[in-house]
A protein has these predicted regions:
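Membrane-anchoring hydrophobic helices of lipid-metabolizing enzymes
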Residues: 1-92, 97-108, 128, 133-139, ...
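Structural beta-strand/beta-sheet cores of well-ordered domains, especially the beta-sheet scaffolds
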Residues: 71, 89-91, 116-124, 140, ...
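Conserved Motif II region of HX4D acyltransferases
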Residues: 89-96, 157-178
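Glycine-rich, histidine-containing beta strand-loop boundary motifs that form or position
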Residues: 95-97, 107, 121-124, 175-177
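Metal-dependent catalytic core segments for phosphate chemistry
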Residues: 108-112, 116-148
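Acidic, metal-coordinating catalytic cores used for nucleic-acid/nucleotide bond scission
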Residues: 126, 150-153, 178
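Catalytic core segments in nucleotide and nucleic-acid processing enzymes
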Residues: 143-159, 171
């Protein structure tokens, strides 16, 4: 603290820049096309088998095991209208949020609709499990630390989301959190 009181304006600015860069490194997400392809082909097949196994009446039927996860997901509403909106600009999806599965289900539904993937903020708790973290880190999720209350952190987070929108990355925002 003594050092801060006697620091020059330039030194203070450098320190502020370092803190902002550290916050940005904590927040930034990644998107890997290979992981996306795996997530939209292999994983849905496995989930479909699990969902079918939960229905004892369907276990005896080989055709029910071959059905895809898309048979378990219903997409209703103005899908064509959403596609037309995408032609006009960046898509921002703002649904209600009730569980940690919401971003997974919405991401898969967006894929089934033939739309490009969405970037989205996710709480740090979703990065605790190594398997979940791998997918979150490679499917466009950026980290949101809800415990950080510093104004600078919130500004860096807001700027990250703003720049993503300005660069035409489609986004998913859950205003209510979980």
């Amino acid at each position: 603290q003594k050092r801060l009181r006697h620091a020059s304006a330039r030194d203070l600015r450098e320190l502020l820049d370092q803190i902002a860069l550290r916050f940005a490194a904590e927040i930034v997400g990644n998107f890997d096309d290979r992981v996306y392809k795996f997530s939209t082909t292999v994983i849905p097949t496995g989930l479909s088998v699990l969902l079918t196994a939960m229905s004892p009446g369907k276990l005896g039927s080989l055709s029910s095991l071959r059905r895809g996860l898309s048979d378990h997901v219903q997409i209703q509403g103005s899908v064509d209208h959403v596609r037309k909106l995408l032609d006009k600009g960046t898509l921002v999806v703002v649904p209600t949020h009730s569980s940690h599965l919401d971003s997974i289900v919405l991401g898969y539904a967006v894929h089934l609709m033939g739309l490009p993937p969405l970037l989205y903020g996710a709480g740090l708790n979703l990065f605790n499990n190594p398997v979940t973290s791998f997918f979150m880190n490679n499917l466009g999720a950026y980290r949101v630390d809800r415990k950080k209350t510093a104004g600078l952190y919130k500004e860096v987070l807001k700027e990250y989301a703003t720049v993503a929108l300005e660069l035409d990355y489609n986004n998913l925002f859950f205003p209510g959190g979980t």
